[in-house]
Amino acid sequence: MSNRFAVILAAGKGTRMKSKLYKVLHPVCGKPMVQHVVDQVSQLGLQKLVTVVGHGAEMVQEQLGNVSEFALQAEQLGTAHAVDQAASVLANEEGTTLVICGDTPLITAETMEALLQQHKEAGAMATVLTAYIEEPAGYGRIVRNENGHVEKIVEHKDANEKELAIKEINTGTYCFDNKALFASLSKVSNDNVQGEYYLPDVIEILKNEGHIVSAYQTEQFDETLGVNDRVALSQAEIIMKNRINRKNMVNGVTIIDPSNTYISADAIIGSDTVLHPGTIIEGNTVIGSDCEIGPHTVIRDSEIGDRTTIRQSTVHDSKLGTEVSVGPFAHIRPDSVIGDEVRVGNFVEIKKTVFGNRSKASHLSYIGDAQVGEDVNLGCGSITVNYDGKNKFKTVIGNGVFIGCNSNLVAPVTVEDGAYVAAGSTITENVPSKALSVARARQVNKEDYVDQLLNKKKS
């Protein structure tokens, strides 16, 4: 196999997005568009990858890190000019170079591999990825000769009436003999309506020099969608969502209503897990097997163990063990670690807490900045009072502790193993192991008080 290189064009400003966010960084199913492209081209066995950046260069570099080298297009003068900015990295290399736009998040490695194979088998100097569509308005047209060979690519704005009738379009993805590409770029003119240096002109230059120019027509037109505005962004989101949902269902995940279920591109879900309508799974979430998620549940950047149930709840940046029950209407906030066989019930909020195996907070509780042992029962209305208006403090609850209903644990405080806290207590000091702590006013019953009060009011 000859050397393979790729150039990703990601320098466009994206004016039509009408956004402060750089265009190729807009997410599709939770991942920036350009990251989708990089993830796919990285499967092609590349020797070098160069991303051409312009507006928002630093943000793109931060997103992609050391996966790619970068070239700066300080002034946007067209796609040929953009590719030429990679000359310092690639111009002297022998091999095949793939050129693709950073705003095509739906492209797959399989389609690009097919393009590269067509290029190799045809012995071509250039091969363009094309598609056939009924309404090609706005796309460059593929002009072929009487033998069906590619002659040139004409941009929509420069096409004549005959060329506008062509329905085979340029998708903006190409592969070239690397040295032929960079030798041809200097020959590209900007004598066109836009006054730009078009990369498709390289096709005509190579053809006129007698080189073989090939085309690979994909049947997956959706993959070639370029995102230039919010409408196209929403279209890409829907297509990617359906693709992700289908992949999960094929792999053994039950999705009750795929049209109302959203799974990020990087999420991993085990077999025989059921997702109910309104479920949103974001970021790098990993969900085990035999789980039941939803309805109306959001999980972000979290790890969920096998056989866990989460109903109408939110889990962020946390880890849950196996056979955990969460919800309905619970909120597990970042940096929480929930053990196995735990119950987090309705209207319970847990934040930055380690919650031990088989422990439970069944309803109406707030547990923050705490370490909760195993086999602990937190009664209804249990509160860790962790904030004094300036600093956060830790509550430690040992194994086998029983906290009665409507109790406040004022941190920093420790309740040792096996201790009991009576209902209605406000605990401000440590509770020894196996002690009963009662911290509430003693009940006083005043006999016949009501009759005396009512008689007094009558008089």
From Swiss-Prot:
Acetyl-CoA binds at N386, Y387, A423, R440. Transmembrane segments: none annotated. Residues 252-459 are annotated as: N-acetyltransferase. It is found in: Cytoplasm. One of its GO terms (cellular component) is membrane. Its cofactor is Mg(2+). One of its GO terms (biological process) is cell wall organization. The active site is at H363. The keyword Metal-binding applies. The keyword Cell inner membrane does not apply. Catalyzes the last two sequential reactions in the de novo biosynthetic pathway for UDP-N-acetylglucosamine (UDP-GlcNAc). The C-terminal domain catalyzes the transfer of acetyl group from acetyl coenzyme A to glucosamine-1-phosphate (GlcN-1-P) to produce N-acetylglucosamine-1-phosphate (GlcNAc-1-P), which is converted into UDP-GlcNAc by the transfer of uridine 5-monophosphate (from uridine 5-triphosphate), a reaction catalyzed by the N-terminal domain. In the N-terminal section; belongs to the N-acetylglucosamine-1-phosphate uridyltransferase family. This is Bifunctional protein GlmU. The gene is glmU.
